[in-house]
Amino acid sequence: MRMVDLIEYKKNNGEFNQQQIQFIIDGYVDGSIPDYQMSALLMAICFQGLTAKETAMLTQAMEYSGDIIDLSKIEGVKVDKHSTGGVGDKTSLVLGPIVAACGGKMAKMSGRGLGHTGGTLDKLESIPGFNIYVSEEDFIQQVNDIGLAIIGQSATLVPADKKIYALRDVTGTVSCIPLIASSIMSKKLASGADTILLDVKYGNGAFMQTLEDAKKLAQTMIDIGKHCHKDTRATISSMSQPLGKAIGNSLEVIEAIETLKGNGPQDLEELCLKAGSTMLVQAKLYQDEKEAYKALQEVISNGKALEKLKEMVQRQGGDVSYIENPELFEKPSVIMEITSKETGYVKALEAKNLGIVSMKLGGGRMTKDEDVDHAVGLVLNKKIGDHVEIGETLLTVYARNKVSQEIIEEIYQSYTIVDEFVEKPILIEEIVK
């Protein structure tokens, strides 16, 4: 078998079999297939696509390119969730504790932030002492004991995806649905959970710009799950504006703590309750979503959900006093309110722009090796559908140094304010099974 023949074959819309896909993945991981040939193949896939069967076979070949996490020693159904990423997306910090407080077992491996989107690990590391590097043995023990652990991804998990993703990033082949789906699902399948809930986001702050593309991506990943006999479901949610009010690492942890106390933003709470109720049904702990939804509300109101977050922080070496008293989180020296120059209703709020502003303040990274400043970021006062008067605060900036005029202008450009009434947007479009 020759790689050049396979490139020609896909260029002419041929359908690969399992042996051909295995040859490609094995060869690229061991270095016998060079970047330039893999780049040509990825571009051919972008133009010609992959069938559902090809996508599933590609996912499995990638999944088995490295270590597979064995969670069989964890009692009960192991649930996992994955968000396709967005701005202000701190759902794992709320969802993990509420699901575990209802008896769910969530053994989660998370990633870091890159570009305008934040990463769960960066948020957790804003809690002093919190350790994301836990041995597999301790990880399994912790989930058995308290139902929850969130750790960093193993370096030996899905090496094929690491190599292919780095190549896609520099060859204009990122926004290809079969390649996105196989990248996400290979990591989720290798992580060993019994069920997967995907939160597929769309809009200006998300990977997928349109609802139509988000639905296609969700369905592609669900089909992969079915092929691999894994209960996979998806919520399709809007990222037309940031989720919740906080953007930035410790600011988002504080907001997650408030949500676990029942005082969080309505959109964040709604998404976590709906996603959590689907996960509890997947775990066979509840018969239907309504019952599960009530149980999740109950663990928030009786304090068990917050207690579960404290347990996880304590087990992973973090300082629990920060969860008990979020005022302890470091505040940067510059706290600046950005006020409205006009009266009206917020019609649009560019989530991606605000994510980039937070990154420029030091809260995110342009390259994977950069450090992040956990204390900086933004807290929104006004979101889509809110009425605003001249001089009212649109958002508050938390910064290390004087906020530049350029950043202030970028914030103003992120808001569109109109005279006529604006409806608050729908957050969750649908749940796909």
Where in the sequence are the language-model features?
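Well-ordered secondary-structure scaffolds
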Residues: 5, 10, 15-18, 28, ...
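Alpha-helix C-terminal capping segments
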Residues: 47, 93-107, 187-192, 227-228, ...
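N-terminal glycine-rich anion-binding loops that anchor highly charged ligand groups
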Residues: 1, 10-73
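Phosphate/diphosphate-binding glycine-rich loops and adjacent basic-rich segments that engage nucleotide
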Residues: 144-193
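Active-site cofactor/substrate anionic-group-binding motifs, chiefly glycine-
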Residues: 49-110, 114
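Active-site-proximal beta-alpha loop/turn segments in soluble metabolic enzymes
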Residues: 42-46, 123, 161-170, 199-208, ...
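Short glycine/serine/threonine-rich phosphate/pyrophosphate-binding segments
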Residues: 87-96, 100-101, 108-109, 115-118, ...
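A glycine-rich helix N-cap at a beta->alpha junction
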Residues: 123-149, 219-225, 229
